[in-house]
Amino acid sequence: MSDRVITNLNTYATMAFPKALEIARTKKHISLILDKKGSVLSIGCNEMRTHPEAAKIGYRYNEVHSELDALLRLDKRMRNGRDFILLNYRFNRFGDFRISRPCAKCMPWCTAIFKEIIYTTRNGYEIISGQRDYTDSIVLSIDQFNMKTIMGTNGKATH
């Protein structure tokens, strides 16, 4: 994994948080797809809309999860890339991290597509090495931070 991605996890969070504020639900999931250099290629969020791919995967109510939304927003010519990283964020209404591990329906296809999957926990982040058995996970010890400390509730950076 790129050191640039690891050192910029909180920067990516500041990109995800304003998008999370737009979601009316209490559980605000945001997914970013990055290339191996750490450039953001696509951003997705949980959507109440339906999609044929969601039905194929077997999501309840055929509703699109953030991981699938980010993949669908990715240019079709790029979807076969093997060095992509999935970053999953979940925030509560106070801007705190919550567990955003891909669900049982998302995990098999995510581990097949993404080289690494990084998701938030209450204590920071966890990394799953993709493109293999998803039970092998590596905990990344990065202290949790509250988005309110770096962003105002209006979604604009405070410093």
Q: PLM features: residue spans?
A:
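Zinc-dependent deaminase catalytic domain
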Residues: 1-159
